[in-house]
Amino acid sequence: MSNTTVEQFAAELKRPVEDLLKQLKEAGVSKNSGSDSLTLDDKQLLNAYLTKKNGSNSSTISIRRTKTEVSTVDGVKVETRKRGRTVKIPSAEELAAQVKAAQTQAAPVRPEQTAEDAAKARAEAAARAEARAKAEAEAAKLKAAKAGNKAKPAAQKPTEAKAETAPVAAETKPAEESKAEKAQADKMPSEKPAEPKEKAAKPKHERNGKGKDAKKPAKPAAPAVPQPVVSAEEQAQRDEEARRAAALRAHQEALLKEKQERQARREAMKQQAEQQAKAAQEAKTGRQRPAKPAEKPQAAAPAVENKPVNPAKAKKEDRRNRDDEGQGRNAKGKGGKGGRDRNNARNGDDERVRGGKKGKKLKLEPNQHAFQAPTEPVVHEVLVPETITVADLAHKMAVKGVEVVKALMKMGMMVTINQSIDQDTALIVVEELGHIGKPAAADDPEAFLDEGAEAVEAEALPRPPVVTVMGHVDHGKTSLLDYIRRTKVVQGEAGGITQHIGAYHVETPRGVITFLDTPGHEAFTAMRARGAKATDIVILVVAADDGVMPQTIEAIAHAKAAGVPMVVAVNKIDKEAANPERIRQELTAHEVVPDEWGGDVQFIDVSAKKGLNIDALLEAVLLEAEVLELTAPVDAPAKGIIVEARLDKGRGAVATLLVQSGTLKKGDMLLAGTAFGKIRAMVDENGKSITEAGPSIPVEILGLSDVPNAGEDAMVLADEKKAREIALFRQGKYRDVRLAKQQAAKLENMFNNMGETQAQSLSVIIKADVQGSYEALAGSLKKLSTDEVKVNVLHSGVGGITESDVNLAIASGAFIIGFNVRADASSRKLAENENVEIRYYNIIYDAINDVKAAMSGMLSPEEKEQVTGTVEIRQVISVSKVGNIAGCMVTDGVVKRDSHVRLIRNNVVIHTGELASLKRYKDDVKEVRMGFECGLMLKGYNEIMEGDQLECFDIVEVARSL
């Protein structure tokens, strides 16, 4: 006979391929799949294995059972069985017989095998005859017992449930076995009544196959078929194993319950009141769950039956101490349903676990308790930055984002998971969820800058003082510096006024002094504030012939706000109108008291033009510096402040940096606000290239990624990555702040303009050479706005006028102001083609005056009355269908046909209107001059009397100005 495959052989035997492969493997035949070929020798080995395995006891014969009675137990879930049907399962002996028959048909058998098979067949025939008689007697007894159980009262319902769970399995048992099993079931816990009987009823092939064939639909009851019956000796052995298994389960359950109670008490001592209640409820649930397996009629334990008694005892201690991985192996092992159900009872598993391959997929929880023990809540310390998204806040608190959204909804805020919330709201949410919130910029990379600075410690050495020269416009600040520097800076300033912050360092016999020259014009308030911030000493210049002016008072306020000492230089004492004493009195009124009057401020009378007392002024400055004991580390990364910044067409972003500490070197990575970059070049105030600059030295630097804002702090970092990270973070933060301000301004303007007429708007685009200039110009122009005409600065920036500026002006109807900058050729051509006006200025006065004139032209003209003449009514003539006609004499001026008139009676205005007609004799005339008579009628008014006067006037429109 040719070889057959495992799958074909399984079909002949009517067995699953998986079971046949397993049996072949146990018999020593290695087959991996159903397509593997199966030889005659393989079949003989399988036959010998099955014969040896199932025929180990001479008196043991597996039986085939037919179900003739069906249990109808209320509340018992039966998932794999059909009611009222016969379940026919082939036994291992039948499988062996089928294998033998197939082998007999395929090839001649050996003599010794034939003799053995013949003896086996005779024994089976005798056993079948005996089994038939016993089965019939057992069926009759079972029917009688069931009829008696139905007659019992309802009070014995639990006992009935135990008795009715067994008939399916008890059909094929002897009477003695049934009584012994019932007595044993009464001793077991109530949740395991059906297991021992089902264990005794299940044949070995069902245990080996894990109950797969039990799921097949049962056939209708057939005529009595001879069935093999187990011997009394094997039955007694099975009873003993079942009793031991029941005792083992009862002991395990008692240990489990005791362990659970012990664990629950230990957890309850650690938790608060609300966790204690929860733990008690969960522990109660865990103690009740072992009763659930009573609903599982399939929960027999053939695993115990299939093994000797001693190995079961040995596993008792092993199961008690096994870990989670061991439980999983036991659930998937050969033990079948019994092992799984015990594990399910231990873990409080309410779901039914099916046998076979499904049992291998059983996934046990790592914790063998019925509930997850509650843990003590963890309180986090959450650092909340200025703004934070809901998702980030939830991540910091280790909670789900939906919890934060719920908390915000309770507060009346409808937010999404990616929406940003402010710091105050976030702190409230953190406290609401039981954590500790602290306001801090935890995610701010700038928080690490201070740590890095503290790590670098260098010796602090004396440094030159930084002196800021402040005062009113045209009081001689720049001229004073010119004399000190021996230069003519003032001649280079447009209009003779300073419009930038100039930074210079001067070497004197007593040391180096760094000077900052600030603008005195009122438009440059921000520049003066920056100058005071970066300075050590302030020289307040006051003209002796002019006195204290508004910007002088402002400079005093800046110096006091910055907390820096002042030295007053009373300039222009060489003029005839100079009055230094008056200056001292006026400054004393502003709490600037001279030292000779008992104050703490030095007053020096100087003349910048003639150089009088300049050395005394420098001595006073150095004296103040000695008192301050100014020091700074030299061998350290540089830190400083951006004094001024601009965009140069050929060199890019150019910034004037005042080094405050450390040494700035060419090639350093510098971070200044939102700009960063490697310093490509350093230039001093004289235009000379240098490679390094120490404390208190001003330098111009090139190489930044963008034009930084004036007044920003600058510092040298170790690597570009950190500088880029901080710069990008600042850009995002500034963008959020700017958008928030714009939104607030839009809302504010919307409410302010509600109900008002639309005002005229003058749109302007400002481009300047440095940031301070366009800040000053934009601020000054905005101050010109009135309720009727407003200045709208669409864009302001540093650098020349580009095509994008012209395109913006085209779209918005604006004009462009270039302050010390020019437009390139392409921009000029585009502006000419599109009729865009570009105005160039180098003096801030001129720009402000021109814009003021343009705004004045946009104002609606003012209407004024101009009296042209006076008329006296001397006669009133009434004409029918026409009205009253006044005969008048022009007493003053002239009366015109289109004039407005005002009727006056007894010096009281009675009527104001227009003339309907003006005649002299019978002719219509345009005007009548003084001394002539005329006749006239008023339009729509006839109540005139003799003696009334008419005042003639014209309405004239007069242009307004700001």
Swiss-Prot record:
The gene is infB. Keywords: Cytoplasm, GTP-binding, Initiation factor, Nucleotide-binding, Protein biosynthesis. It is found in: Cytoplasm. One of the essential components for the initiation of protein synthesis. Protects formylmethionyl-tRNA from spontaneous hydrolysis and promotes its binding to the 30S ribosomal subunits. Also involved in the hydrolysis of GTP during the formation of the 70S ribosomal complex. This is Translation initiation factor IF-2. Residues 517-520 are annotated as: G3. Residues 145-155, 219-234, 270-283 have a biased composition (Low complexity). Residues 607-609 are annotated as: G5. Residues 496-500 are annotated as: G2. Residues 117-141, 173-216, 235-269, 314-327, 338-354 have a biased composition (Basic and acidic residues). Residues 99-366 are annotated as: Disordered. Residues 471-478 are annotated as: G1. Belongs to the TRAFAC class translation factor GTPase superfamily. Classic translation factor GTPase family. IF-2 subfamily. One of its GO terms (molecular function) is translation initiation factor activity. It comes from Neisseria meningitidis serogroup B (strain ATCC BAA-335 / MC58). GO terms for biological process: translational initiation. The lineage of its organism: Bacteria, Pseudomonadati, Pseudomonadota, Betaproteobacteria, Neisseriales. Residues 571-574 are annotated as: G4. GTP binds at residues 471-478, 517-521, 571-574. It comes from the Bacteria. Its main location: cytoplasm. GO terms for cellular component: cytoplasm; cytosol. Residues 462-631 form the tr-type G domain.
